[in-house]
UniProtKB/Swiss-Prot annotation:
This is UDP-N-acetylmuramoyl-L-alanyl-D-glutamate--2,6-diaminopimelate ligase. It comes from Rhizobium meliloti (strain 1021). It is found in: Cytoplasm. Keywords: ATP-binding, Cell cycle, Cell division, Cell shape, Cell wall biogenesis/degradation, Cytoplasm, Ligase, Magnesium, Nucleotide-binding, Peptidoglycan synthesis. One of its GO terms (biological process) is cell wall organization. Belongs to the MurCDEF family. MurE subfamily. Coiled coil: none annotated. Its EC number is 6.3.2.13. ATP binds at G112, T113, A114, G115, K116, T117, S118. A motif (Meso-diaminopimelate recognition motif) lies at residues 409-412. Pfam families: Mur_ligase (PF01225), Mur_ligase_C (PF02875), Mur_ligase_M (PF08245). UDP-N-acetyl-alpha-D-muramoyl-L-alanyl-D-glutamate binds at S34, T154, T155, S181, Q187, R189.
Length: 486
């Protein structure tokens, strides 16, 4: 493929530089990591939070890069094909899309602070129950027929993403649901994906170490509607969040077919919910039709996630009857209010990914209706991340749980004792146990009939990062081990 094919009509400032010999440059691959450059590759130099790709242009050229695309103002390399444009990140995404050239026919993306993984997972399951070969891409990795791969990023980099989409298409996958993180949207990682529909779940405090304000955080998420979703496409929005009105306004301004779901929804209207220990039932209205739905998962927020997923499925050709029928067979996403086991006395032990204030509040509130005893929570806060949320989460835990144990959760380069102290300052009556495994053992050991334990923060993760080293650690495994020792 020639570099002119990648520039196309989307990047006239690049096309204007591709004259003479430059127009004939052949591209054998694309990367934004100079260490991965192979002879004939195109190196796209993007500025990151820790390093600027422009500093590695010489390294990329020495490894055989056939050309370099970098940001405006990048110094020219003598005799080297270095082309400067205003938005190399967007070019990287579009170029990766053009280079790999294939994706599943029906793609949807979901953004929001919480619920992205569950919505993507549920949408995939609804499609699959309707007979389609379907995949999901997100925080827990990739799930598709014949493959389950753990991933570390909610939204992969553009090159990895489009390579994956091409592989899925070649494997016969026709439908795919993916998470769209604020980082991924802000960094243009999804700009080359062709979407059939998109969704918004909610907005709460998160990534304040990256976004200067919550308004910037919301604006990054709204790029999904304003820049990526084709005009006139369905935009499914959860209607009961404090930021729903802003999301609806953004989607309407972009010219989309807005479809709201929830208690205030007009596409899928939630009229009644009954909570049970391991399941929920609800009445929903779609137009003049009334449906009784059953979701085999605990937690009010899972009803919200299920409705958003049903909205996406219905917006991509699935009937309401088929979508709601599929909800009865849902399997929860790994580490999302996942029941790991119970004591001999029947106390339940869950693992949940809640690592931000709203998510912690949601999960603690969700288990209260079926908890006849005490709600016990074990949690911590990550190092080198938003420090402002630590006392907020401490207050939430002490207010909504009966027993709180504060422990470590990926302290990274920070001093664990300092992180715990910042949480404990607002966590009235909490117990501090730094060793996470010991904290889990202590929590399980105190459980009585009717109690519910939530081990929050890690969910599906299988490591504890201390300093620069990630040590093997699984909340699931530690909970099972503690239950087995009773």
């Amino acid at each position: 493929m020639k570099i002119t094919d990648l520039a196309g009509s989307n990047f006239p400032e690049l096309s204007a530089q591709l004259k003479g010999d430059a127009a004939t440059i052949e591209i054998g691959g694309i990367t934004a990591d100079s260490r991965q450059v192979k002879p004939g590759d195109l190196f796209v130099a993007v500025a990151g939070s820790k390093a600027d790709g422009a500093a590695y242009i010489a390294d990329a050229l020495s490894r055989g890069a056939s050309a370099v695309v970098a940001g405006t103002g990048t110094p020219a390399e003598a005799g080297a094909p270095v082309f400067a444009i205003s938005d190399p990140r967007r070019f990287l995404a579009k170029a990766a899309s053009s280079f790999y050239g294939r994706q599943p026919e029906t793609m949807v993306a979901v953004t929001g602070t919480a619920g992205k993984t569950s919505v993507a997972s549920f949408t995939r399951q609804i499609w699959a129950h309707s007979g389609f070969s379907a995949a999901m891409i997100g925080t827990t990795g990739v799930v598709a027929p014949g493959r389950t791969e753990y991933g570390s990023l909610t939204t992969p980099d553009p090159v990895s993403l489009h390579k994956l989409l091409a592989e899925l298409a070649d494997e016969g996958v026709t439908h795919a649901a993916m998470e769209a993180s604020s980082h991924g949207l802000d960094q243009r990682r999804l700009d080359g994906v062709e979407l059939a529909a998109a969704a918004f779940t909610n907005l709460g405090r998160d990534h304040m170490d990256y976004h200067p304000t919550v308004e910037h955080y919301m604006a990054s998420k709204m790029r999904l509607f304003g820049a990526l979703l084709p005009k006139g496409s369905p935009a499914v929005i959860f209607a009961d969040d404090q930021w729903s009105a802003e999301a609806i306004a953004a989607a309407r301004k972009a010219g989309h077919d807005v479809r709201t779901v929830g208690r205030n929804g007009d596409f899928i209207a939630l009229k009644r919910v009954e909570h049970f220990r391991h399941k929920q039932s609800a009445e929903v209205h779609v137009g003049d039709d009334i449906y009784e739905i059953h979701v085999p998962l605990a937690g009010d927020f899972q009803i919200a996630n299920a409705l958003v997923a049903a909205g996406l499925a219905m917006s991509t050709g699935i009937t309401a009857k088929a979508a709601f029928s599929a909800l009865e067979r849902l399997q929860g996403a790994s580490g999302r209010l996942e029941l790991v086991g119970q004591t001999k006395d029947g106390a339940l032990a869950y693992v949940d990914y809640a690592h931000k204030p709203d998510a912690l509040a949601n999960v603690l509130e969700s288990v209260r209706p079926f908890t006849t005893g005490r709600v016990v929570v074990v949690f911590g806060c990550g190092g080198d991340r938003d420090k402002g949320k630590r006392p907020i989460m401490g207050e939430i835990a002490s207010r909504l749980a009966d027993v709180v144990i504060v422990t470590d959760d990926n302290p990274r380069s920070e001093v664990p004792e300092v992180i715990r102290a910042e949480i404990m300052a607002a966590a009235k009556g909490a117990t501090e146990i730094g060793d996470r495994a010991e904290a889990i053992r202590a929590a399980v050991g105190m459980l009585k009939t009717g109690d519910t334990l939530i081990v929050a923060g890690k969910g599906h993760e299988e490591g504890q990062t201390v300093g620069s080293v990630t040590l093997p650690f699984s909340d699931h495994a530690e909970v099972r081990k503690a239950l087995g020792g009773l």
